[in-house]
Swiss-Prot record:
Residues the entry annotates as binding [2Fe-2S] cluster: 122, 195
GO terms for cellular component: cytosol
Keywords for the protein's UniProt record, in alphabetical order: 2Fe-2S, Amino-acid biosynthesis, Branched-chain amino acid biosynthesis, Iron, Iron-sulfur, Lyase, Magnesium, Metal-binding
Function per UniProt: Functions in the biosynthesis of branched-chain amino acids. Catalyzes the dehydration of (2R,3R)-2,3-dihydroxy-3-methylpentanoate (2,3-dihydroxy-3-methylvalerate) into 2-oxo-3-methylpentanoate (2-oxo-3-methylvalerate) and of (2R)-2,3-dihydroxy-3-methylbutanoate (2,3-dihydroxyisovalerate) into 2-oxo-3-methylbutanoate (2-oxoisovalerate), the penultimate precursor to L-isoleucine and L-valine, respectively.
TM regions (residue ranges): none
Residues the record marks as active site: 517 (proton acceptor)
Domain of life: Bacteria
Listed name of the protein: Dihydroxy-acid dehydratase
Database matches in Gene3D superfamilies: IlvD/EDD C-terminal domain-like (3.50.30.80)
Keyword Amino-acid biosynthesis among record annotations: yes
Family the UniProt entry places it in: Belongs to the IlvD/Edd family.
The keyword Acetylation appears for this protein: no
Amino acid sequence: MPKYRSATTTHGRNMAGARALWRATGMTDADFGKPIIAVVNSFTQFVPGHVHLRDLGKLVAEQIEAAGGVAKEFNTIAVDDGIAMGHGGMLYSLPSRELIADSVEYMVNAHCADAMVCISNCDKITPGMLMASLRLNIPVIFVSGGPMEAGKTKLSDQLIKLDLVDAMIQGANPNVSDADSEQIERSACPTCGSCSGMFTANSMNCLTEALGLSQPGNGSLLATHADRKTLFINAGKRIVELTKRYYEQDDLSALPRNIAKKEAFENAMILDIAMGGSTNTVLHLLAAAQEGDVDFKMEDIDRLSRQVPHLCKVAPSTQKYHMEDVHRAGGVMGILGELDRAGLLNRNVNNILGLSLPETLAQYDVMLSQDEQVKSMYQAGPAGIRTTKAFSQDCRWPTLDTDREQGCIRSKAHAYSQDGGLAVLSGNLAQDGCIVKTAGVDEDNLVFSGPAKVYESQDDAVEAILGGKVVAGDVVIIRYEGPKGGPGMQEMLYPTSYLKSMGLGKACALITDGRFSGGTSGLSIGHVSPEAANGGIIGLVEEGDIVDINIPNREINLRVDEKTLAARREAQLARGDKAWTPKDRQRQVSFALRAYASLATSADKGAVRDKSKLGG
């Protein structure tokens, strides 16, 4: 029978000092012996996805204490990728994931907490907490802040739906008036919550449902809706049950590594492919798998991407649907239900509710459920009122969207395409693979060839795009922006947005060893591995080289012979300690970022730290 970790600090005469300090936090004799559960919050006023979380930790803590546990709250940092984007701040975004994972480990292990409730929401916070959870392997429940309502405004007497990406694109579009640009900006992000499309934050919060570590509705129920409060209340109650199941009944099924096992990771990736999720999820799932010693690799993603159809199309791939529409159609459980009926899921998985996948779908898939409360929860809709407050409205859609032929979520027979929303490409330009969000690629661009325009920083690429130096048919190469070369693997949302602003969104390709925002669409290929800084062939591309992209065949190649590439490699090596670094880039890199770069692996490994360099 496992012993409560917290007993290390609460039992025994030699722990009198620790108990004295616990008493100073409000604990009493009656609390010593109860499970100490960490409420891992991520409230900050910097990030709209987290601005409403201040009181939600207290809400969870109250439920923990009422159920017989002791709750202790702490906060992690949270970076807003949208605010950090387009300048040096983006260098810090991906490295913050490791900082978050480490800070959770530090706090939980230093104080011997028995379990956790992770209150996350935005891009690197959910992955960082997920990595920590699998590293620590103590009972955990994820409950996120929820998605933002989609923006809505009238332009030319037409009501349109908006999100952050629209503000970025139209802000740089010379054909959009200042007045219209300002109106879009003011309307794009109307409420608290994670940005309203299938961007990285919402993708990851959906995947925690598929992994079995969060409750149904976690990924899609709006931040502003009163029903979301129930998820927080239930998380506080349920974590005490999970904790006691493990420590008092020796029930290993309560542990995250026994919930988020390989079959669950495959289900999460299948979901991601089916819903056209952010390419960043690939990076984060690979990283989380390594933390949990799960044998889940790029090869698995490639295999799955060839089998799974595209069942759910959401912004930025279409402006018709946002997360509020996914929720109305049944959310993650609705998509999983269609995948299950298509025979594509591993059914031998369980979750924090203690239910198998078939049991969960029977209760929470709106196409199967007879539970009126479940149906009502999926009818939770937007209010259209600007607010930063959680649970501030109780609006409902009049009906559910159960149209699996023409609705937001489709059955396999009526899929948007039989090819999934993400694909792994490989070839001489990406020998260890790269990722493209096929859900956002125009059908005419699935096979594309063109001359390379080579840039050694995102800034240079943006200047060239806005300066008219990139023309239709070009393949824009942005290199030395990988985990090591950036450092920090910047998101390339501004270059892709500006290609659209210049009318080139469907006329050019963009390839990078950096990554893309979940808001990216178009022929945007990222995570090229090995990255340029690790000697990847992307570092040998020269201006005018022809690049061939074939998404149906999963190929990406540089049309340059081996002899020429060998000569270019020799020229690189002749640069000595400057080899595999950008030639003319002016960039200030702090000590903290240099430390990150010294251990960073390429994207095909999840951009995690190279344990072999630490003797691990």
